[in-house]
């Protein structure tokens, strides 16, 4: 199931983590349409924006993320992701169990959710993980 047993926040925005059996449905309803609803509540409706979000949720998401399109026979298998992983939520630190002078990469301020395993990559690229991070971590 895609979702999470508790509300988490992405920044200061609560996330609707209600469970869905389909990644496409979770993404369309609990990310795109949920954020549209929050925007309309705060700023009033925007007919053009609403139309674009709904069209994306109804037409684009099923084509790109729909069941049977990704993940082969198994489909998309939900994995726990951080949910808000960007350079401001990552650093180098020392955990209490570590010896003096030791440090390691740490991440914090999660917006955890069971999601598509590649969801995090889009967020990371959009908000500030640069090539140098990948060279140091994956290279």
Residues of each region from the PLM?
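Active-site Asp-x-Gly
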Residues: 19-28, 35-37, 74-80, 87-139
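Compositionally biased, intrinsically disordered low-complexity regions
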Residues: 5, 13, 70, 90-95
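GST-like fold's C-terminal all-alpha helical module
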Residues: 61-66, 70-71, 77
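Active-site catalytic-loop/activation-segment of kinase and kinase-like phosphoryl-transfer enzymes
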Residues: 6-65
């Amino acid at each position: 199931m895609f979702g999470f047993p508790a509300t988490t926040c992405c920044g200061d925005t609560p996330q609707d983590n209600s469970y869905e059996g389909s990644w496409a449905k979770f993404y369309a309803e609990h990310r795109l349409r949920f954020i549209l609803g929050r925007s309309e509540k705060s700023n009033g409706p925007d007919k053009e924006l609403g139309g674009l979000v709904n069209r994306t949720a109804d037409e684009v998401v099923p084509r790109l993320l729909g069941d049977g399109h990704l993940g082969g026979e198994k489909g998309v298998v939900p994995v726990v992701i951080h949910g808000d992983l960007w350079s401001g939520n990552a650093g180098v630190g020392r955990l209490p169990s570590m010896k003096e002078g030791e440090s390691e990469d740490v991440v914090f301020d999660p917006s955890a959710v069971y999601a598509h395993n590649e969801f995090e990559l889009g967020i990371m690229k959009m908000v500030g993980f640069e090539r140098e991070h990948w060279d140091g971590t994956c290279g």
